[in-house]
């Protein structure tokens, strides 16, 4: 990753020193649940990278809560209940979902904010039938494939302190939004919103962007050559596992041989995921407050922290 003057850069070893004796609340059993497909996340990496990050986020949450109390007191109104919102962005196959799950687990262990909800933007994709009638399913994951109005309304409701908000649910097995199913968000202390394009700016002047609602943005970065390799490895693993389920949208790929599956996954990367990364996702990295830079082994090797 190129050096960016607006960030302070810490090696993994330097960042680990910022843990400040924070105890590690997770076990290897917890990691088995949190770890993503083909990822080698270890307790050591959680302790050296994610635990210090959770400490930083905890300090940010406390400061934001105090600032809101001061503002509400100044305005002479009751102290409102609004969650601290964290956005996590990054490419397909980079491990942002695992990052989100680990941070959710760690942040929920801090006593001041035990209720941490994780919401993915997959649920805000237009249903397949709508996408097929518009740009086509090959554009799924590109900015135009999301119902941004609905996503912004969800975030506005969070901001307003709405007591219960229903969020659409996406199924990776059926490759579609699940009709009639919802995740209910009930005034949590923290909301983590994870998705490819969550750090994008507004499409036009004066428009509201999803990232306008974030208290802090995180971008998970890796070199494209590594991302391509990880994507192909993940596809091959899914072909031998989840794709074998007859109800899976991708069941037809389960019978592919190794060479055919590799070629197919590479084609998907080169024609869909790669261009989306280059055109839409990577340009949003500069909007992040924290960049987690991964090496070829999927481990975070540096943390880029925006200067105040």
UniProtKB/Swiss-Prot annotation:
Pfam families: PRK. Belongs to the prokaryotic pantothenate kinase family. InterPro entries: P-loop_NTPase, PanK, PRK/URK. Its EC number is 2.7.1.33. It comes from Sorangium cellulosum (strain So ce56) (Polyangium cellulosum (strain So ce56)). NCBIfam families: panK_bact. It is found in: Cytoplasm. It comes from the Bacteria. This is Pantothenate kinase. One of its GO terms (cellular component) is cytoplasm. Keywords: ATP-binding, Coenzyme A biosynthesis, Cytoplasm, Kinase, Nucleotide-binding, Transferase. ATP binds at residues 90-97. It is an enzyme of class 2 (transferase). GO terms for molecular function: ATP binding; pantothenate kinase activity.
């Amino acid at each position: 990753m190129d050096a960016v003057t607006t960030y302070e850069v810490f090696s993994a070893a330097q960042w680990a020193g910022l843990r400040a004796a924070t105890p590690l609340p997770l076990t290897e059993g917890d990691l088995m649940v949190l770890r993503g497909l083909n990822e080698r996340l270890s307790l050591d990496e959680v302790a050296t990278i994610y635990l210090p990050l959770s400490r930083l986020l905890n300090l940010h949450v406390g400061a934001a809560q105090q600032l809101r109390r001061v503002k509400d007191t100044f305005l002479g109104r009751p102290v409102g209940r609004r969650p601290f919102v964290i956005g996590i962005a990054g490419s397909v196959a980079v491990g942002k979902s695992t990052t989100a799950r680990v941070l959710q687990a760690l942040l929920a262990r801090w006593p001041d904010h035990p209720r941490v909800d994780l919401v993915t933007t997959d649920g805000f994709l237009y249903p397949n039938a709508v996408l097929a009638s518009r740009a086509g399913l090959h554009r799924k994951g590109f900015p135009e494939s999301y119902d941004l109005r609905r996503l912004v309304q969800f975030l506005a409701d969070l901001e307003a302190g709405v007591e219960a908000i229903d969020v659409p649910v996406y199924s990776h097995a059926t490759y579609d939004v699940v009709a009639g199913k919802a995740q209910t968000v009930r005034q949590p202390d923290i909301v983590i919103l994870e998705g490819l394009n969550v750090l994008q700016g507004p499409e036009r002047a004066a428009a509201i962007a999803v990232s306008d609602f974030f208290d802090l943005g995180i971008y998970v970065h890796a070199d494209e050559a590594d991302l391509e390799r990880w994507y192909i490895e993940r596809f091959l693993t899914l072909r031998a596992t989840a794709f074998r389920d007859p109800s899976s949208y991708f069941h037809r790929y389960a019978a592919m041989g190794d060479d055919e599956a590799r070629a197919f996954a590479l084609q998907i990367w080169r024609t869909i995921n790669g261009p989306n990364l280059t055109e839409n996702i990577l340009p949003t990295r500069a909007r992040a407050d924290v960049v987690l830079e991964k090496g070829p082994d999927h481990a975070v090797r540096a943390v880029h922290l925006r200067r105040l």
